[in-house]
Structure formats: C-alpha cells, structure tokens
Curated annotation (Swiss-Prot):
Associated pathway: Bacterial outer membrane biogenesis; LPS lipid A biosynthesis
PANTHER family tied to this protein: LIPID-A-DISACCHARIDE SYNTHASE, LIPID-A-DISACCHARIDE SYNTHASE, MITOCHONDRIAL-RELATED
Annotated Gene Ontology cellular component terms: membrane
The protein's name in its UniProt record: Lipid-A-disaccharide synthase
Length: 385
C-alpha cells in the first residue's frame, strides 16, 4: 500500500484522442485526490487540468512505418529522456495512453525499475501483430480496454485487463442536436452539409487531402446544392488543407473551422472521414459516413502482411459486420469516394442508426470513472494523516 501525502502519476498521451482520454482520467482522479500530480507528455486538455508536459505531444504524432523510421532518432531520444525523468520521479504509477509502439517499450523499462504500469487503450493485438500480447504482459500491470471484445482476448492470455467503455460514448448524447450544432457554427439550418475530416496529423492530410478535395468536386456534381464543412485541428493543418484546395479545386467552396470536429459532425447530414477514433465519434453522433484511408505504399505493404482482420473502422469492428463503407489504400480514389458518399446520402439510414444506438449503449460505461477506480485499486493508495 502506498503511504504518502500526494499521489504522483506519470502519463504519456501520443495524440489528440489520447489527450481527451488523459484529461478525462485526470478529472476523475482529481475528484478524490485533488492534490495529485501529473507529469509526462500531454496535450492542451490535460495541461488545462494542471498536467506538466516534459515534451510537446506533437513529438509523438507520427503515422505509418516509414514515417516513424524517419523520426526514430528523435523518438528514441524522447523515450530515453522520459525513462530518466520518470525513474527519478518515482511515481505511484505510469499510465501510457494509446501510442503502443512508443509507450509499451517505455512501460517495459519502467516496470523493470519497480514502477507500476498501466496501458490505457488496448493495442489492436486482435487485428495485427498478435504476438505483441507477450510483450504487453511483461510491460504492464494492467490494460484498460475501451472495446468489449478486447477483454476476452486478454483473459485468454491471462493478462490483467479491465473493460472501461469509451469516454466518447459517455460525453456524446444518445441523440445529437443538428440544429444546435449548426447554430454554434453559424451554418444554414436548411442546407445539406457534408462534413469532410481528412485527419488530425500532417501525414494523414498529406495522403488524404487531395483525394478528399477531388471527391468533393465530384460530389458537388451529384448534389449541386450540397455544402462542405471541414474542421482542422490547428493552423498548420488548416494551411495544409487550404493548399490542397488551392492546388486541386480552387473554385470549390469549403467552410473551414478550427477545432470543433464534434460540432461539425453533428451539424452534417453525412460525413467523409479518415479511419481512426473519429469514426467512433461519427458513429456515436449517428450520421451516415464513408471511411477512407491510405498510407505510403511501403507502410501498406508491410501492414497488410501483418493484418489479422479484414475490417478497419471502429463501427464495423464493433458491429462485427460492414455497416459503413471502407475505402482503403487503392480504393481511396476520388471516384470511389464520391460514389460511396452518394450511396450513403441516398440510402435508408434507419437500420444503421439503430445499430449505432445499440453500440452506443454498450460503450456507455462512465469510462473515466471506471478507469480511475482501476488505477487507484492498482496503486492501493493510502494518505498519511
């Protein structure tokens, strides 16, 4: 049992979705331990709650095998620095939030130093590179999983795992308010809108901005009155998207918003988006969607050999069947994207919406609170009077 006057947590979040999860966990821990200290790598939401970042979260926001290799020296430097700092800090627990290729190696080193470790968000070991489960078993004291089918996989391999649900399912109402979202964004209440989300990372926009913009041109031909709205996570991504628009569709009007991706999706009649956490958010908001994604040819070639599943998007993985169209790599073309969007906007959405509602209830578990309880049980903290 840990007996001290203050709980100390080291945490590393690797991207925007990890920042959201980290902030939720911090807030839940602060309810019972308001003086707890949090140190490591976090984003703006975590920092707003008092998180002490040793490096910018952007350092870890790289995608694809090839892209990671080009940044490897810097990533190794960051990890070595974190190992030194966290070992000296001697926190009650280290919590790695997603970013498994970075965090699991870090957890392995810290656990060897006697520090309790938690991995928040199960790596997709059930989908590809399943042998990672053995490294995870050595590296972590506990995995916090967001998806219900993951716990069975860990139980099978006798790795401690707690299913906590997903914070997005807790945060997003069961019925989203389109009119309110449009009012917030100052959008026309009567127009038809397609939300375009090409990702939050530079590498994603490099791959997806061009086909998404070109697809929008083709969609405009199918639906002359449709309007487009795109949320960009920051000014850098906005400039990147604006350049793609200038290069490939200079006469196309796309309303751009900084941040507010959830409001943009809620305001839309349909969504075109990159594969990733945003697909879960779109499912919870319950809008027709088309998921498209591509990476560098080498990254895809390597990943394809390792894949254990034939679905990529979270709605399809959760449903166990194809409820939304996926256009991956060679299928991620303007023509195929535009055709798929046309089908989704014209089809009867009611059966798909009903499935989205069912999945929303499954994931709605007060995730941050459950995660905090699991972490505190692991730490077994007792205050000194």
């Amino acid at each position: 049992m840990s007996k001290k006057s203050q709980l100390v947590f080291a945490m590393v979040a690797g991207e925007l979705s990890g920042d959201i999860l980290g902030a939720g966990l911090m807030a839940a821990l602060q309810k019972t331990h308001p003086n707890a200290r949090f140190v490591g790598i976090g984003g703006p939401r975590m920092e707003a709650l008092g998180f002490e970042s040793l490096f910018a979260m952007e350092e870890l926001a790289v995608m694809g095998i090839v892209e990671v290799l080009s940044r490897l020296p810097r990533l190794l430097h960051v990890r070595a620095s974190l190992i030194k700092s966290i070992t000296e800090l001697k926190p009650d627990c280290f919590i790695g939030i997603d970013a498994p290729d970075f965090n699991i190696g870090l957890e392995l080193k810290l656990k060897a130093q006697g520090i309790k470790t938690v991995h928040y968000v199960s790596p997709s070991v059930w989908a590809w590179r399943p042998k990672r489960i053995f490294k995870i078993a050595k590296a972590t004291n506990m995995v916090l999983s967001l998806l219900p089918f993951e716990k069975a996989f860990y139980d099978k391999h006798q790795v401690p795992c707690t299913f906590v649900g997903h914070t997005l399912a807790d945060d997003i109402p069961l019925e989203s308010d389109k009119a309110c979202a449009r009012q917030v964004l100052e959008l026309d209440q009567e127009a038809e809108y397609l939300a375009i989300l090409p990702g939050s990372r530079g590498g994603e926009l490099k791959q997806l901005a061009e086909p998404f913009v070109k697809a929008a041109l083709l969609i405009k031909q199918q639906f002359p009155d449709i309007r487009f709205v795109t949320p960009l996570v920051n000014q850098k991504r906005r400039e990147q998207f604006e350049q793609a628009l200038k290069d490939h569709a200079p006469d196309l009007e796309i309303h751009m918003v900084e941040g507010k991706s959830r409001e943009v999706m809620a305001a839309a009649d349909g969504i075109l988006l990159a594969s990733g956490t945003a697909t879960l958010e779109a499912m919870l908001i319950k809008r027709p969607m088309v998921v498209a994604y591509r990476v560098s040819p080498l990254t895809y070639s390597i990943a394809k050999r390792m894949m254990q599943v034939n679905r990529f998007s979270l709605p399809n993985l959760l449903a166990g069947c194809d409820v939304v169209p996926e256009l991956i790599q060679h299928d991620c073309t303007p023509e195929k994207i535009a055709a798929a969007v046309g089908v989704e906007l014209n089809r009867d959405f009611a059966p798909i919406k009903a499935e989205f509602e069912r999945l929303h209830q499954v994931l709605r578990c007060d995730a941050s609170q459950k995660a905090a309880e699991a972490v505190l049980a692991l730490v077994d903290f007792k205050e000194v009077n």
